[in-house]
């Protein structure tokens, strides 16, 4: 049973993904791709703002992952703008919290200042979860600032036509030729 049950369940789920779920999802993705490729600049900026805000809403939670999965799905259709907006916006919360602990040291205790250093490094790697301790401690101030910052970042990214072909990597994707 230890070997058979996982094998059978993987087979059932895999076949369901291919034959039941795959075709409708492919159709939806094709429609979204067509819409993205034909939209004007204003709509692209709005999409960037929405995706950017989603990336910062729960910092690694389901809303964040939905935006990320959307961007990764578009990579297969060679639509690279949304992924750039998603990655740039996803880096906002940890970078903002890390910079805040350095700029306004007196507003943070020693443990938070150390957490800010870690958040800064995680932010450079596109790991949003570095900002969670700050958001958990003061959600009414941290979350709105991060969401607005992420939305602005996503909008700017789409407005300038930034493109990203890598699904992850943060600042380190700049090293890829």
Model segments located where?
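Pore-lining transmembrane helices
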Residues: 1-177
């Amino acid at each position: 049973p230890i070997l058979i049950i996982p094998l059978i369940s993987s087979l059932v789920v895999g076949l369901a993904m291919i034959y039941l779920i795959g075709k409708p999802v492919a159709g939806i993705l094709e429609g979204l791709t067509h819409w993205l490729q034909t939209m004007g600049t204003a709509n692209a900026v709005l999409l960037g703002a929405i995706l950017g805000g989603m990336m910062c809403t729960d910092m690694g939670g389901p809303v964040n992952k939905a935006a990320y999965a959307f961007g990764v799905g578009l990579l297969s259709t060679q639509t690279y703008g949304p992924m750039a907006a998603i990655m740039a916006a996803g880096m906002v919360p940890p970078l903002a919290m890390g910079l805040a602990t350095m700029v306004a040291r007196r507003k943070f205790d020693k443990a938070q200042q150390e957490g800010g250093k870690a958040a800064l490094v995680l932010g450079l790697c596109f790991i949003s979860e570095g900002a969670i301790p700050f958001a958990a401690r003061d959600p009414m101030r941290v979350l709105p600032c991060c969401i607005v910052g992420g939305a602005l970042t996503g909008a700017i990214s789409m407005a300038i036509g930034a493109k990203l072909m890598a699904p992850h990597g943060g600042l380190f994707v700049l090293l890829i030729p």
